[in-house]
Amino acid sequence: MTRPSEGGRIEVICGCMYSGKTEELIRRMRQVRIARQSYRIFTPRMDTRYAEGHVASHSGSRLEAITVATMCEILAYARDVQVVAIDELHLFDDDPAEMVRGCQVLADRGARVIVAGLDLNYRAEPFPAMMHLLALAEQVDKLYAICVKCGAYATRSQRLIDGKPAPANAPTIVVGGLDMYEARCRACYEPAL
């Protein structure tokens, strides 16, 4: 946990679908609330799976959040707060370089910036903003799900279309849940062709 005297920092919570990223973000933000630190939580406009104006985990935990599309909006809302939380980083409409730059600006202002999101897309390729933040962050927590095929630790998000792995030419970002994605380990993951 960051003390105000320590200055700004970036914390990244990453992993595949169903690894508990948002659950961990919510847990940290509940601690922030108990500590009476000022904060703002942001969720991308593109994420329409749950009630607007909330970050919500697959297990049903949720906290109020501000729905935005760009880092410019986050920077405007996050003035003079101690903690900034950004869920589902990979779903923001903004240029990945702007998302990274904005996180750096917030941390340089002295904020604790907590970012959660997928590290890899369904093709097992890194999301650009997350890839850079993993290198720049003071703290990185990679979470794992359980492979639906064999029960091993899962690190991949398998996108399914009609029950079969999505082809390589499918859109990179499609918001969905259990009906569209499975958590899989390296051995059970079927590469997009």
Curated annotation (Swiss-Prot):
Coiled coil: none annotated. It catalyses: thymidine + ATP = dTMP + ADP + H(+). Its main location: cytoplasm. GO terms for biological process: DNA biosynthetic process; thymidine metabolic process. Zn(2+) binds at residues 147, 150, 185, 188. HAMAP family: Thymidine_kinase (MF_00124). Homotetramer. This is Thymidine kinase. It comes from Chloroflexus aggregans (strain MD-66 / DSM 9485). The gene is tdk.
